[in-house]
Amino acid sequence: MALWMHLLTVLALLALWGPNTGQAFVSRHLCGSNLVETLYSVCQDDGFFYIPKDRRELEDPQVEQTELGMGLGAGGLQPLALEMALQKRGIVDQCCTGTCTRHQLQSYCN
């Protein structure tokens, strides 16, 4: 009987010290189908929207020029905004080449 009480106490302490569900997803590499499945899990019913860079360029060849302030408009982006646009990375670069958190994945949800 004392052994069972000791075992239950140890199990309770392990449960308290174990990672909770909010912290279980820290930062990880996600590529290919693992990335897509994780996005489905994170976004759930909201879904997500993603156009690969190659396809986006085929649909609108001026998208990069406009994003970087080289297209038509009122003089393009300011220097700080231009620098941030140059550093902007897609989800594959962010999560497959590097690592991403649950919060970063949620930014790709609709």
UniProtKB/Swiss-Prot annotation:
SUPFAM superfamilies, A to Z: Insulin-like
Intrachain S-S bonds: 31-96, 43-109, 95-100
Propeptide: 57-87
Localization: Secreted
GO biological process, one term: regulation of protein localization to plasma membrane
InterPro entries in alphabetical order: Insulin, Insulin-like, Insulin-like_sf, Insulin_CS, Insulin_family
Name assigned to this protein: Insulin
Encoding gene (name): INS
